Amino acid sequence: MIDDHYKMGLMAAEGYLELGMPEEALREFQNLPRDVKLGVEGLTLLMEIHRAEEEWEAMESVAERIWEAEPENVTHWIDWAIALRLSNSPSSARVLLLEALEKFPEEAIVHYHLACCECQLGNLPSAREHLMESKKRCRICRVLALTDEGELQPIWTDYSAPQFQC
């Protein structure tokens, strides 16, 4: 259990992140005691700092440690997969997400991120299947797909290409 003094430090760092100030968030993080830094809350904060700084390999390393601490939480699988994909390991992210799908078969967000991986790998039929499955299971995934900033671009490009039949 984290005492109130250190909760304030975590909250201050989270506030800095929300304000787009990752350097200040890191400074707050560094002032936390070692046991808080190494707990899931502290590691999650550090992972988010790395995400904000686009330090994908560092994010991947921390995300894996969080996943090891709490493998029953689907969010940790997703965070680790995102970090793998963004650090140019989409095939590793895909393997991890397929494992997550076995463990969490009803989780739409796993399908959504599998669609992103499959797009990056050029497997558009599989990407479409996972995207359709995610949208069927969760309205939020529909919004994610519609507001996508490029991860699913190969699907949209493929849909807009003229279809000729010989």
Language-model features: locations:
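Register position in tetratricopeptide repeats
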Residues: 18-19, 52, 86, 120, ...
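TPR/TPR-like (Sel1-like) alpha-helical repeat modules
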Residues: 119-143
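Alpha-helical adaptor scaffolds
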Residues: 41-103
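Alpha-helical segment of the N-proximal tetratricopeptide repeat
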Residues: 4-35, 41-52
